[in-house]
Swiss-Prot record:
GO terms for molecular function: chorismate synthase activity; FMN binding. It catalyses: 5-O-(1-carboxyvinyl)-3-phosphoshikimate = chorismate + phosphate. Reduced FMN (FMNH(2)). Its EC number is 4.2.3.5. This reaction introduces a second double bond into the aromatic ring system. This is Chorismate synthase. It comes from the Bacteria. Gene3D superfamilies: Chorismate synthase AroC. Homotetramer.
Length: 371
């Protein structure tokens, strides 16, 4: 069974390969009458676009998006382009492929990549840039995420790179306003300067390094999530784990919660305004029992160092002969950098899906009643 789609009511299907003519997605289930312009999607794609600094791949892709269906504009809409409730198809052309860079690994498996497992499963693989397993596929996710954000009124989703290899930010210097001021999406201005020096050395060595990304959603109402097998945190974890190179996900304090006592980990409550409680902490990351609590939803995921490096590594050929692999081509020394907008997009898609599912089950009722 193929699994190129995710979501229930807000459903996203992506298509395309790294070196194919194009990639894209189909978003089905977007409500009608939502204003949507290509420029809004393009703004998100530009944040992920390669070749914008020396710290990312130098593959030059404009990532220009085309909306092929699902929108309409005429004098009755005041000239505004609105969603129609039908599937929204988006396409992004590939224009800077260099397939010849991969000719040497046509019959050899790259260690740490999906070369062997794809061929073991399908009996065939597209060796040009990794084909479907390439992080290039995530451009389509970011495009879908831009639409998902439009479904979530009042919700703000932001991401940041909070750790580069073993080098974590200083939480005392965390500033969302800094994220757009450096090429790392780093919220710590001091750490960003240090990371530039570290990554320059990594690049000079022809190696790579991992990272930790944090994504926070604020303004999420309480009540989203479908226990017990459609918990909000379970779906978020699955969405983040589906991103290329992600090897771990945590919600709230995550694994650090295992080091706490019960009284330390409890998110105590006091009476708040409007009949809703006021929380005194957010160790749970905004999700309790698989349902959003109204607090900020906090998710972190770990990205491994890419295996596309210049260091010679032992491997085997398709006919099981010993081989040595040196990966050529243009690659990110830290794939975690451009994973930040991808993580935001996946958060948006999951929340949009759960928002529509919640509305379909319980309607538009307020989660709390006064009096």
């Amino acid at each position: 069974m193929s699994h190129n789609s995710f979501g229930h009511l807000f459903r996203v299907t992506t298509f395309g390969e790294s070196h194919g003519p194009a990639l894209g997605c189909v978003v089905d289930g977007c409500p009608p009458l939502i204003p949507l312009e290509a420029a809004e999607i393009q703004a998100e794609l530009d944040r992920r676009r390669p070749g914008q600094s020396r710290f990312t791949t130098q593959r030059r892709e404009p990532d220009t998006v085309r909306i092929l269906s699902g929108v309409f504009a005429d004098d009755r809409t005041g000239g505004r382009q609105l969603t129609t409730g039908t599937p929204i198809a988006l396409m992004i052309e590939n224009v800077d492929q260099r397939s010849k860079d991969y000719s040497e690994i046509r019959d050899t498996y790259r260690p740490g990549h999906a070369d062997y497992t794809y061929e073991a499963k399908y009996g065939i693989r597209d060796y040009r840039g990794g084909g479907r397993s390439s992080a290039r596929e995530t451009a389509a996710r970011v495009a879908a995420g831009a639409i998902a954000r439009k479904v979530l009124p009042g919700v703000t989703i932001r991401g940041a790179l909070v750790q580069l290899g073993p080098h974590a930010i200083d939480r005392a210097r965390f500033d969302w306003n800094e994220v757009g001021n450096n090429p790392f999406f780093c919220p710590d201005a001091v750490a960003a300067v240090q990371w530039a020096e570290i990554l320059d050395e990594i690049r000079k060595d022809g190696s790579s390094i991992g990272a930790v990304i944090e994504v926070v959603a604020e303004g999420v109402p309480p009540g989203l999530g479908a226990p017990v097998y459609g918990k909000l945190d379970a779906d978020l974890a699955a969405a983040m784990m589906s991103i290329n190179a992600v090897k771990g996900v945590e919600i709230g304090d995550g694994f650090a919660a295992a080091t706490l006592r019960g009284e330390e980990n409890a998110d105590e409550m006091r009476p708040g305004n409007g009949g809703a409680p006021a929380f005194l902490a957010n160790h749970a990351g905004g999700i309790l029992g698989g349902i959003s609590s109204g607090q900020p939803i906090v998710c972190r995921f770990a990205v491994k160092p890419t295996s596309s490096i210049l260091t010679p590594r032992a491997s085997v050929t398709r006919d099981n002969r010993p081989a040595e692999v040196v990966t050529k081509g243009r690659h990110d020394p830290c794939v975690g950098i451009r994973a930040v907008p991808v993580g935001e997009a996946m958060m948006a898609c999951v929340l949009a899906d759960h928002y529509l599912r919640h509305r379909g089950q319980v309607g538009e009722r307020a989660p709390f009643r006064e009096g």
